[in-house]
Amino acid sequence: MPVGLIALALGGFGIGLTEFVIAGLLPDVAADFGVTEASAGWFISGYALAVVVGALGLTAAVTRLERKPVLAALLVLFIAGNLLSATAGDYWPMMLGRIIAALSHGAYFGIGSVVAAGMVPPSRKAGAIALMFTGLTAANVLGVPFGTLLGQAAGWRATFWAITVIGVAALAGILALVPKSAGTSSAPGSLRSELGAFRSGQVWLSIVVTILGFGGMFGAFTYIAYTLTEVSGFAASTVPWLLVVFGLGLFTGNTLGGKAADRNIDRTLVVVLAILSVVLMVFALTAAHPVLTVVSLALMGGFGFATVPGLQMRVMKYAPGAPTLASGANIGAFNVGNALGAWLGGATITAGLGYTSPIWAGAAITIAGMAVMAFAAAKARRSAVMARTVSGAVGSAARSAAPDAVRVPR
């Protein structure tokens, strides 16, 4: 694989870390700024909503520009946002830093996917894209636990300083290692042609499933530090190691979910969302039992991220004419789900329903996502059957209308 892919993955690692590590540091950040848990939760919701704006707005704005300079500019934006977060002295400067960093998120992964695919032969494109997204997976498996540990040991600001350094390293790597021609073999289309791909009803159903399917897990994950310490009885110092368990489940689920989706996307998503709903409900019921909590964490990460490859593949399948914008839009949809889950979980805590209530809220969102996915799958099956029926009828009519072969006497 080209070394430029490592630079792309490093950028993905930094972006994934800045998105997810805040969950483990939320109690420390809330205490430092003197705000409630729900108010601190907006550092996650605000980030997620800004990702949506960047995924759609920035990606649409740069579809006709050279991709390597755009990626570099996005990382400069990412670095600036994390630098502001690391130095923020109050709630709102921190929020502004989160928003600035988030604007680069969706566009980076959307455009980066095209660049990664352009660096390798056609037979290796999927592997190249997967390698770039390995940075995001590694951020959850290793970055979040150790970023949380660093924040607890040296203060949460130290984690954001570290993320800033990672961003600088990724920027240097992209400038030095990514070829200027990468991703230019497929010329960017006009914004009108990219938007035209969104006329498909299945694209919109897929985006709704992404929002609900991913939002359910984030309803539980956003306030997981509170659940682990206040309900399960774990010491705050053990939270980073428990997040390793979550990350290992995530890595395993992401890998196996991709293989299952290669065989049948719709069936995989319906089954995985159904199992995730059950896992979340069992987690809410057994959160007071430490051993069962550890098992639930692994399963929540596994089944939560087993949806990701299928959700991304489904949107791309039904929007083949919009490779850049569809990819960015689905990244935005993941983060709408992130914001929805975080907001609803915070609302249940504010209502005095306790620290397991975000998990129940997540289960409800996931069940809704499963229902939409089942509807979308059934609709797709009906359309496929109808298309085969029409095709067969046209073929039969053509054969009937053809004249009999004329036999020439010898």
Residue ranges of model-derived segments:
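Cytoplasmic helix-loop-helix junction between adjacent transmembrane helices
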Residues: 97-135
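C-terminal transmembrane helical hairpin of 12-TM major facilitator-type secondary transporters
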Residues: 267-311
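Conserved MFS/SLC helix-loop-helix module at the cytosolic interface between two early adjacent transmembrane helices
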Residues: 53-92
